[in-house]
Every structure is written in C-alpha cells, then in structure tokens.
Amino acid sequence: MTDLQTPRLRTADPAPSDSADSSCGPDACGSAPVRRTGSSALRTRVDIALQGIRVDAPVHREAGAGPSDDGHVMLGGLGAAIPVNPKSPYAVTNGRLLLDGADIGLDVEPVKRPRFYDLSTADGVSYEKIARLHGRNILATTVVQTCMRYDEAERCRFCAIEASLANDSTIAVKTPAQLAEVAEAAARLDGIRQMVMTTGTSKGRDRGARHLARCVRAVLQAVPGLPIQVQCEPPEDLAALQELKDAGALSIGIHIESMDDDIRRRWTPGKARVSTAKYWEAWDEAVRIFGRNQVSTYLLVGLGEDPDELVASAAELIERGIYPFVVPFRPLKGTLATEVDHVLPPAGSLLEKVSEQVAALLIAAGMLSSGQKAGCAACGACGVLKTAGA
C-alpha cells in the first residue's frame, strides 16, 4: 500500500484528555497537516473538515451515531459540522474565518441554540435527549441508541453510538409519541425543514426498520409534509423498505462505509458479515421504491482503501442511482479507532482528490445533494461534496 492508502497512525501514544474542548480525541485534529497554500474554496473546506476551528459553537454534539464531536456553523452560507479544536490554525473573529490571524474571505456564523432544547416531556425527558438540531434547520435522532454489534469484537471501530447513552446525553429508545412531540415543537419554534432518523441495529429481521416506520408515521401526523430520511442496515426482509416508504419517508440511507471487503472486516467486523451483495440487493430495491438519488450510503475516506478503487466504487453506486456520501474518517473520543488504534484523520490531499473526483461523477450524472429530499447527503455538512458542486 502507498502512504495514501494506509490509515495514518499516531507515532506515539498520546496522553488521554478529558478537556471538553478537545472534541476530536487526544490531539487528533491538530495532527493532520495544515495546508496553507492555494485559495480554492474546496481546499479550505477540506482543511477545516480535518483541522477544525477554534469557535464557540452553541449547537454541538459529542459521541453518538455517525460523525460527531463537532460544532455546527454556517460557513460561507453552507451548513458545516466542524471539529471544535482549540489547536486549530483556523479561528473566528467578528463572523469572519481567520487562518493564523489573516482573514481568508469566508463568513462564519455559529448555529444558534434552538428554543426546543429548553423543553421537556411531561415525564421529564429533555427534548434535547430525544432529538438534536443539525445545521440550521434539520432535526436528527437515533431512535434506538443501542446496537446488537456493539461488543468490542463486533463493533465498528469508528462508532460511538452507545457512548452518548453512557454519558446520559440521550435515552435508549425514543418512542413515536416522543418524536412527534419534539418534531412539532422544533418545527413551530425553530423552523426545522427536514428530519433524519437513524437507528442502532436490532436483532429482528427488519434490523429496526419497522420501529423507524412507526416513528415516521407519528411525526408526520404531528408535522404533515415534513421531509424525512430514514437510515438502517439492509433488512433481511426487504419488504420492510416498502413499509418505510409507505409510512411517509422520502429517502433512505443504507450505509456500508467501505466497499472493500478487507477494510470492512478490519473496521466493521460485525457489519462485514452482511455481504456486499446483500447491500446491493437492498440498495437496488430501495432505488426501485424511493427513486434515483433518494438512496445514499456513506463512504469514509481514510480507512486505508485504495483511493482509485474508492472512486470506482462510487461510480458504480452512482450508475445505479445511489448517492455515495463521501466524508472523512473523524477520530472520536471513546471509539476503538481513537483509543486503541490511534488512527489519524486522512491526509488533506487524499480527501480533496477523492471528493473532487466523486463530485465530478455526481455532477455528470445529474445527482446533486440539492435533488435529495431529506437526509445526510441533502444536508452535506459532514463532508465537502457540496463545496465541490455536488
């Protein structure tokens, strides 16, 4: 493997840090090389995705499912979920982004804390523990905060889904009624415009899809017309995908993270037992049900996959109507990748190259994030594809 293909490891075992503002794990954000040349918007966005920003972000998230340990800002008018890193060379002053003290021409506006966070259910559960604001106007929730694959030998090495449960920042299971109550308040008080519902994987044949369907129905009764994306593993019974559509979901994410089976076995040992062929079956059926460009999957840059093969896999996904949401691997506190493996974020040159090439493929296919009705790819804040035009 070349240097671009190998996950970047820390050369020394860093001392653990419990500082609340060291959001990227011990020194992780400060470890990737800072690229200070060039003026392209994409290059700057890549740098920020890896280096983070020194900023007070009222809307932030630690641990949980998916990319986290970040703060939410509007960066040049686009939503961005950025590592909050006190060692970053990037800082915000008077609403402008500075690199080593120099204004680089981008407006930055931290997303304001939503009003619905101040409310609680009748039985005393904070709305913030039920669903979170992502970006300026997206409501997100993990409807089941546990995963059947969370034993250490099975767990995805980048995942912290149960860490937020352990630190009491969420609850294990969100009921349809709770989600409907929170969504109604978030729409009324804070103007949310779409919702994302993901779930830890359950042992049932539906892998949690049917609970998602119940939650979608309840939310749409409370907030008619709200665009909703659902996310789950490929269900053994693919009929569950139609049930999600019938419940009112407009788009779906079925996330594989890597198309390289060796990488999958190394990074996602439990999920890797679901074959890539099973993912293709689920994706193809989901495209039939939800439509082209309404089905997406995460592809993580920085797990060690050959970059040319990653782009080729993205091209195959695009050809079959699936949006490959390319995002950088982000070291998170409490994950095996950070605490045991000491893996660093990818090199900026790798993230830029892959994102630029995948964006070109998406643009050529007419599959843009703006064409997605709801979801992570529609938001785009965790990656740089929107900055690249896709």
Say what each PLM segment does.
Residues 227-235, 283-308, 327-331:
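Conserved strand-turn element in the central/C-terminal portion of the radical SAM core barrel
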Residues 220-225, 289-292, 365-367:
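Short helix-capping segments at alpha-helix termini
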Residues 240, 263-264, 306, 335-337:
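Short Asp/Glu-rich motifs
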Residues 77-157, 161-172, 189, 373-382, ...:
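N-terminal [4Fe-4S]-dependent radical SAM core
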Residues 143-147, 201-203, 232-236, 258-260, ...:
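Active-site-proximal loop/turn and secondary-structure-junction residues that shape catalytic pockets
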Residues 1-99, 285, 289, 308-390:
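Auxiliary Fe-S-binding modules of radical SAM enzymes
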Residues 138, 160-179, 186-240, 244-245, ...:
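Core AdoMet radical
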Residues 236-246, 301-319:
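Catalytic cores of alpha/beta
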